[in-house]
Amino acid sequence: MKKAIHFQSQPVVFNCASCNSNFTIDSTAKQKDLAIDICGKCHPFYIGQLTKQTVHGRAEKLSQKFNAGKAFLENKTKKSNQAKVEKQTRHRSINEL
């Protein structure tokens, strides 16, 4: 075996940011303390609390965006048409003329 090419293993403390648990593992990391976002004690997959999400494809997402845009434009034109009709049908008094 060649010398000075092998990784140096040392005990490293991993700190979970979600559940504040600490555990020590032999690792080749150079830091003595490492912060991780989530661990096996608090990850939903490992504790059995998975939430089912509906996954849509790209085409379905795009069509939903277009449908939402069409609905917005239809509501906008209806409101502007109603405002025009109200403006035309409003009777003016002599003082307003």
UniProtKB/Swiss-Prot annotation:
Residues 75-97 are annotated as: Disordered. Residues 84-97 have a biased composition (Basic and acidic residues). InterPro entries: Ribosomal_bL28/bL31-like_sf, Ribosomal_bL31, Ribosomal_bL31_A, Ribosomal_bL31_sf. One of its GO terms (cellular component) is ribosome. Keywords: Ribonucleoprotein, Ribosomal protein, RNA-binding, rRNA-binding. One of its GO terms (biological process) is translation. GO terms for molecular function: rRNA binding; structural constituent of ribosome. Belongs to the bacterial ribosomal protein bL31 family. Type A subfamily. HAMAP family: Ribosomal_bL31_1. Binds the 23S rRNA. Part of the 50S ribosomal subunit. This is Large ribosomal subunit protein bL31. It comes from Mycoplasma genitalium (strain ATCC 33530 / DSM 19775 / NCTC 10195 / G37). The gene is rpmE.
